[in-house]
Amino acid sequence: MKTFSYTAHSKQVLGDMHTPVSIYLKVRDMYPQSALMESSDYHAGENSLSFIALCPLASIGVNSGIVTASYPDNSRKEEPLTQSFTVEKAMNQFISQFQVTGENKNVCGLYGYTTFNAVKYFEHIPVKESHDEQNDAPDLLYILYKYIIVFNHFKNELTLVEMLGEGEESGLPELEAAIENRNYASYNFSVTGPVSSPISDEEHKANVRKGIAHCMRGDVFQIVLSRRFIQPYAGDDFKVYRALRSINPSPYLFYFDVGGYRIFGSSPETHCKIEDGRAYIDPIAGTTRRTGDTVKDRELAEALLADPKENAEHVMLVDLARNDLSRNCHDVRVLFYKEPQYYSHVIHLVSRVSGQLNEGADKIKTFIDTFPAGTLSGAPKVRAMQLISEIEPHNRGAYGGCIGFIGLNGELNQAITIRTFVSRNNELWFQAGGGIVARSQDEYELQEVNNKLGALKKAIDLAVNLKN
């Protein structure tokens, strides 16, 4: 098995004249297939970093049960998944082929996503297959990039990190010149037709009633049912990302350009984070609309905290997060519980569950064992996912999966792919859902989906009017 050795070199420049968006606009045409990951929570030291990843060196993807690895020497390897050759083994094997030394090597890792559909590789869950002839998206894709631009918003610092192989010349001067360039191409965005959904409001309400019936029968305690929307468009979808990050700032902002398609969004929810030997899950369960009036919003948050249906849902999903972490962790505890957090269109109840990794626990396996999030599937998780496959008329694709970073040391930070667009073939696909329990009401659940979609639909409207 071949290995690839790199040294990470870095250069620090003053960052007070730059933003992640301004730099991304300058470099994206020169470095196609790039990724942008931001945090809007600049006030907290722990969430004060944003990243731009440029120039793919290598990647690992899984599609239709085949693992495809591409390497810096332009070689490719394909191997089918088997009972012994699992996604976990493939990922660990791929990571082990890269050795990186030098300063800031911790940001040199894999940036990418795992779709909800990938659950079929981890559990016996049927998934409706659908593939795009022109721009098919793998069920899972993680990319190693040559350059990482790191923004430290807390310190106003910009660090350019480059992975260099032996004998390679630095490309940092060209990258720095691109960043300092005052000019960049600008493109418009427009919608070319009305937004549509594969199912009507009444059909979604009927699906909700099916979910309630399964809860009443005791098949599940809770099930998350979602609905997809499609918006045809022309032009530059990055304007939709810019609008969304402005309307709905979140801890996880991301724009991944994978060539034939793009995945971008503004997620409030940590799927799984592993750092310094501890794993974290931040379940969000319990949602109400936001009015923008401070007094009314506080009253709505208090009503949410007192709502028996929302409380039952939240308790269930905190327990599920504890169970998921307990598979590979000890000292599992709840760090904060049912904290109201305010977003542009909604108020969420959020908890944080953490566990100490067992000695010898594999970090990738720990991540996979938490997938998908209970807040996007239900409880018990496997039965809920089986019912989702029966009830929802389409597969979920990226929605409900996760997106983020996996370090070469296995430490990772993954957001749940919600409040997210998938852009492909001049269509924006977006989706939202809600947790169904025995006490749910179909009309309320329909309204909850509309509340969650509010920021996405508003972002499309705003993007049309962005002039530069």
Identify what each model region corresponds to.
Residues 1-468:
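Extended alpha-helical targeting/anchoring segments
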